[in-house]
Each structure stands twice: as structure tokens, then as C-alpha cells.
């Protein structure tokens, strides 16, 4: 899957990430040459590669499915059915089985579940998991939601008593990213 430097630049990337990418490509300015997401991933890491999904055109289905996959990694912590429903609706939408109105309703419900979890303060883990679900549902509205879902899942793993859980979550997200957007595993 490809983007271009001009498409990335249109989305106002952070200065550090932008300069790092240009340097890795031995370039000083944006152009319209196809740029593989695997190149971005290998140069800048997962956060920037996921962020660059915002610049990819015509791949909403894959972006939504990646967001849902990330959120499903922490779905066992989702205490509110509205969050689980949002994942199901986002997945159905990506597969052409739900419409935008259904998706918007699911997104609103997941957002309300997140506020309820935050208000009840029963579990920060539940709040992060709910945030991941709501982010997945908003992928249609903004491709940036893929990063939100991935970040929520990673942050949630980071709350674990085992630091290795965060590393494992990031690794799993990178493997899935390579599979879905790059068609390959890093050897």
C-alpha cells in the first residue's frame, strides 16, 4: 500500500517525524513518487506509519479493519456492551453490511460508554478499552482513528504490571500492520 510525500505533507506531520522520513529517503522536499508504508514503518516506526494511514486514499476498509483488530486485542476489558457493539458495527461497515447512520449511532454509544467508565472510575483499563472501541468506530470519519485504537491498546498494555505486555502489544500491532498494509513480515 502506498502514499506519497505530498499526501503525507498535506496532513501536517510532526516536524521530527517528517524530517526523519525525508532523511531516510535522502530527500529534502515532498514529491509525488509512490511511497510504500513499509518504508515509512522501517524508517520511522509504527506510530508514524499508522499516522500515515491518514494520507492513504481509497483504503478505508483496511484502515477500519486494522482499527477494529487493535481494539479487539483489549476487548476482554470492555465492560460495556456498547463498546463491543461499536466494534461489531465498525467491522460490518467495513464489510458493507452496515451504513453510516448505524456507524454514527454505534460511535455515539461507545463514546457515552467511555464517559460512563471514566465517571465511574471503576477501571482505567476499561476506559482505555472503551476508547479503543470508539476510535475504531470513528475510523470512517477520520483515518487517524487507527492510530487512536492502536495507541489505546498499547497504552492499556502499558498499564499492566508487566512492562513486557506493552512491548508485546506494540509488536503484535506491527506484525498486523505489515500483514494488512505491506503484505509482508519483517525478516
Q: Where are the regions a protein language model picked out?
A:
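Short, glycine-biased loop/turn motifs at secondary-structure junctions and
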Residues: 1-187
Amino acid at each position: 500500500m502506498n502514499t506519497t510525500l505530498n499526501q503525507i505533507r498535506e496532513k501536517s506531520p510532526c516536524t521530527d517525524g517528517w524530517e526523519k522520513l525525508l532523511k531516510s529517503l535522502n530527500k529534502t522536499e515532498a514529491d509525488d513518487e509512490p511511497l510504500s508504508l513499509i518504508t515509512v514503518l522501517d524508517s520511522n516506526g509504527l506510530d508514524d506509519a499508522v499516522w500515515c494511514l491518514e494520507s492513504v486514499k481509497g483504503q478505508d476498509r483496511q484502515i477500519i479493519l486494522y482499527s477494529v483488530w487493535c481494539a479487539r486485542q483489549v476487548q476482554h476489558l470492555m465492560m460495556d456492551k456498547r463498546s463491543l457493539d461499536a466494534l461489531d458495527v465498525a467491522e460490518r461497515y467495513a464489510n458493507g453490511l452496515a451504513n453510516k447512520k448505524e456507524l454514527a449511532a454505534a460511535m455515539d454509544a461507545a463514546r457515552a460508554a467511555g464517559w460512563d467508565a471514566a465517571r465511574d472510575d471503576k477501571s482505567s483499563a476499561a476506559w482505555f478499552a472503551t476508547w479503543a472501541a470508539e476510535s475504531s468506530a470513528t475510523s470512517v470519519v477520520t483515518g487517524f482513528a487507527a492510530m487512536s485504537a492502536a495507541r489505546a491498546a498499547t497504552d492499556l498494555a502499558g498499564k499492566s504490571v508487566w512492562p513486557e505486555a506493552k512491548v508485546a502489544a506494540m509488536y503484535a500491532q506491527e506484525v498486523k500492520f505489515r500483514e494488512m498494509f505491506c503484505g509482508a513480515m519483517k525478516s
